[in-house]
Every structure is written in structure tokens, then in C-alpha cells.
């Protein structure tokens, strides 16, 4: 179905070009700021108050954001970020000094059908050999071909610059254009975030817990459990013909909301808030865009802190039971950090830079097998780790080759540590050897360095002068104690 001409007039004034001026730190050398960069995407007004929807990846590193509405001229308008939801790749921004009279109408992405005609709308950037060519607003017609991992799949090309733009169906926005797969057999496969995902993100309307930049980072719930697929014959045997479909719980993580629900490993989950669960962990009868959906995709239907009912068969009590749980956002320890909104801490000691492990480090070091394995294991992402992001040349760690970049620090002064807070506590308890204070730093592989604190601080002063990074409170304490000079005389 073509877009009505009356709707097109609204679209031309409500779909905006977003210019994001971004900064990032060097995640191996966090005292250095990377060169500013400028990116472009698309967004669209959703109300008369100046709220604009777009993708999180368009603006999540932006220090400054501007929009342009080419149909109304070349003037730029300042924007601020209201929230980002990295898991959904959704961001809401708001104009500071402009309110649009035009905005689009949001549809219902739950009611979509395969084969429906859609329109991808945005400001694509054409990539040439020498420069990027910024195009005017472009309409691309396509067809809904299904869903993958909870995203709407279309045969429409989503080019650079289109990200964050609206996906229209029946004159309403039913998705946010997100990405395109490329390859010999993958061209013209685009994905969009269902618009209903935005509708469940109502945290920003009533929350008062904003950080210092007044930007809300919305995390999402996860049941944090593992299960085994089953067969009807198996379930009939172990439940004496009481259950024919469901999944057997094999593990429940300590951080899971299921931990206090009464559900235990061995129990059989059959229903999540009215959605029957099949033997392979998909919705039994409910289909979206022609296919059953996984439990994780099903959770995308619910709001943060919403209460849902889970029905299960208690294998020990041999009876059907139900429990209500609250879908609380999960605080993953290994996650993406955004320096524009969040303080990023690091600690330099003994010629090494130590940081709390983040997803930013994993992205930067894609070929590291140990880091990659963490990115593939949700249970491992719930654990804090202290990572070595850099080892300075000529430091004892570098000379001895005992501790290397991307190693994990497990003990400091024989005290177990897994984050910077633990490191600070351990540093207050130096080892005493022959009446001298020492510091010992040990990896999870048992490799360590052991140095007198005085030598450690003297070396760090030299590194600080050479590599131009600030000394920390640990250094300042011992500089004063030992009467050391902070000027490098070499």
C-alpha cells in the first residue's frame, strides 16, 4: 500500500537528519581521548513536544547532537538525549529549541503480516571512493519477509545514514530501521526494531534516577536460566502423563529472579504469562510474522518491573504450580559503557593499566579467544573482572613477561580482587618482607610480579612523565611518605 500524499507531507517535515559529534576514549589507554568523529543517521518526531526516535548506535557516543529538516531549510537544531536502550538499539532524543508541528503516528508491530508492503524512509549516505554524498529524504519500497531474533526482516536495503529512520506500513510507523546484512547472498536484507519495543520502554516517563548528564540508560530483564529441550514421550514418562509440552530447567543463575520463585532445576516450565512454551523453548501456538518466538524475544513484550505469571510442573512434588515474578532489569558486569554519559575508571600501577572488564574491551580485542568466550556466555557476563589493558615498555611486567595485555588480575597482595574497588582495598594492605613494603599483583593463571612499593612508585612517576598520564591517590600517598620527586630527571 502506497503512503497517502497527505501522510507524505507530514513525513517530509517529521523525519529528520541527525548529525552526531562523538567522542570516545582509547579503551587500552583510557587517559587518552580519541579524535572526535562525526556521524549521521535518521530520526523522526513522535509528538508535538520535540521527542525524536532513532537508534541507540546513532547517538550513544555523541557529545553534541543536531538535527536538520531539509524540507524546512538548512538550519540545525540542538538536541539532548533522553534515554538509550542498548539492548533494543533504541534512543529517544529531544529538541532543545524547536518543537515540530508535524509528527508521525505509531502503529502496532504485533499485528504485522509476512508479505505486507513497507517503506524504508531515511537520509542515506552514498559511499564513494573519495567522499560521502549526503542524499535527500529517500523512500524505498520493500516487503516484510519474516523476523529474526525479534527484529522485522525486510527485503529493503538499509544504507548508512538510514539507521534510526521509520519503517512504514499502512501509513503508520511499525519499526525503526536498524541494520543491513551484506554479502554475496545477503544483499537487500534489512532489519528494523519493532515499534512496540519502544512502547514498553516507559521508564523515562516516571523515573527520577538520571545520571549527571541527565541521560537514562535503560537495561532490560532476563530470566537468567538454562534449560533442556524435551520430547512429549519423555515428559509423559517423567510426569506420569500429566505434562506433554514444556522445557526442563537445568540451571538457575544466582542473579536470576527465578531464584526465589520456587522453580528449581528439574522442574518443567510450560507457560509464561499465558504463552504456552513448546518442547524446544519456543512459543507453542503464538506466532509473530509466521514463526514461533523464543523466550528471550517473548520477554521483549513486557515492561521493566512488570509482574508476570509462570506455570510449571514441580517434579519433586509431582504437581502443577504457578508463581509470579517481577521482571527486574539485569545489572550485567560486562556491558557496554558510554564515556559521554558515564565515568570510566582506570588505575595505573607497576607500569600497567587496570580496568573493570567491559564489552568495549571485547569489541576492541575481537581476536582474543578468552574475551570472545565471555561475549558468548551470559553467565560469564554477570561476573566482574579486572583486566590489564596495557603494559608500558620497560616496566617490570613487560621485562619479566609475567603479566601481559588482556590478562585478568585475580589477586593483589594475596587478596582476591575482581574489580577496581577490590584493588583499592587490597592496596591498603601491602606485604611486609624484611621490614619493607611490597606490592604483589597476580593473574588468574598464577603469574605475578613482586616489587617494593617505593620502586613501584618511582617507576610509575617516570612512566607518568613519559606518557603524560596523571598519578593517582596511591602514588600521591607514597610520594609523600618517601619524599619522592614527581619530576623526571632522566
Features from the language model and the residues they span:
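N-terminal activation segment of mature serine protease catalytic domains
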Residues: 1-42, 51-55, 64, 88-90, ...
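C-terminal cap/linker of serine protease catalytic domains
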Residues: 1-8, 125, 176-240, 282, ...
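Flexible, gly/ser-rich surface segments that form the specificity/activation loops bordering the active-site cleft
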Residues: 3, 7, 58-60, 83, ...
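Catalytic-histidine neighborhood of serine endopeptidases
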Residues: 47-90, 95-100, 112-113, 118-123, ...
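Active-site-proximal beta-strands of protease catalytic cores
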Residues: 14-19, 51-56, 111-126, 152-154, ...
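PDZ domains, with a preference for the canonical peptide-binding region formed by the helix
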Residues: 271-309, 411-444
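Catalytic nucleophile loop of clan PA
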Residues: 44-45, 156-177, 259, 398-399, ...
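C-terminal, low-ordered peptide segments at domain boundaries
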Residues: 102, 114, 280-281, 288-289, ...
